[in-house]
Amino acid sequence: IFETLAERTLALAQLERRKDPEAGFDPWLEDILEPVLEKCLRHGVKIVSNFGAANPRAAARRIQSLAVRLGIRSPRIAVVTGDDLSSDTYLPFFREALGDALDEARMVAANVYLGSDSVADALLDGAEIVVTGRVSDSALCVGPLLAHFGWARDDWTRRGRAVMAGHLLECGVQVTGGYFADPGVKDVPNLFDIGYPIAEVDADGNCVITKADNTGGLVDTRVVREQMLYEIDDPSAYLAPDAISDISNSVVEQMGPDCVSVSGVEGREWPGTLKVLVCQDGGWLGEGEISYAGPRAEARARMAADIVKHRLGGKLDLRIDLIGVLSIHGDDAGRRLARTPQGSARDVRLRVAAVHQDQKVAELVGREVTALYTCGPAGGGGVRAGLRQRLDTLPCYVPRSAIQSNYEIIE
């Protein structure tokens, strides 16, 4: 399983597809597959991944090209379809769900989070590689389990357990200590060589989480429990396209070094709605950065920010951060920075950013920050200016009955 897609990466993929109809899938697809493709085909190891992103058919074509380049046979590839809701058919649902937040003139794409049934069907049809676009992360795990064990599609208990196994595997090494580590509080050994997780799932859907021997990281009950609660609002009702998973009475036990069992998860019938991510044109993000160091560095950085505010404040809503003083805890309007008394920081980087629908206007941010080299306070350096297109992402829900998922075989 290669789980590579997030809401942000899908939005970026939509931008790439707008520029090039053969782009829009994971840009690292070949880097991911090249070391393993021949071995997987030789040993009958199936590959399931959402690296199709905004363009799974193009991803399948790229895999075929990779096989040719490697001098191996062409794999039997299935492309899961049905997540693209960009047609006008679905606009009434989006209008009702999003109201004034939806700007149809700026709408670029919409993708629904599919479940695993088409993944399972494709594997049962002999697919060696299943390429998806937007499916739930856990569906990449549930699909192979449905196909392998032959569970009834309405076996909600087993599906609910499979959802949790997939949830534990999502985001890769989080369940082996990544994102868990906090030095001196939650120590994890050898994060530089962290091992990816393995889920050993039995016919009832219960699982054991472990990792490869002689790798860094940690699998213990603390890590597993933390990942079980990751992004979950209600432990008794984790909503996924495949089932509603209930972990409120689950049992998490240490079975040995880097080996944890999870049992007692329950499942209920899947929700009647599916989540959709609507992407619409968000204009252009212009930004610029410049550093100040030494005595009175903070005062000089604040002066530089004031210069840019005077020059652009009437045209743009500026986000201003003083990295080294206040940045992550700041706000777009700058209220907290304004309330923060000037200190004596000696290593400060000013960042200015703004969004505008007009590319030329957004570009002014980087130009004004660059001008601070000679038109601003003393000792500024290390200027970086950037300009990139943005997409706004709007989540909503549509009736499951309105969605049709399927797959097609590409050989």
Regions found by a protein language model. Give the residues of each.
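Active-site glycine-rich loop that binds ribose-phosphate moieties when present
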Residues: 109-123
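Gly-rich Lys/Arg/Thr-decorated short loops/hinges at beta-loop-alpha junctions or inter-strand turns
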Residues: 7-22, 41, 85-106
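Gly/Ser/Thr-rich loops at beta-strand to alpha-helix junctions
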Residues: 6-8, 51-60, 134-140, 356-359
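A conserved active-site cap/scaffold subdomain adjacent to cofactor or substrate pockets
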Residues: 159-266
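C-terminal non-catalytic interaction/assembly regions of soluble proteins
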Residues: 264-411
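Short glycine-rich or small-residue beta-strand-to-loop segments that form or flank ligand, phosphate
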Residues: 19, 44-54, 130, 349-356
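Catalytic or ion-translocation cores adjacent to nucleophile or general acid/base/metal-coordination motifs
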Residues: 69-85, 142-183
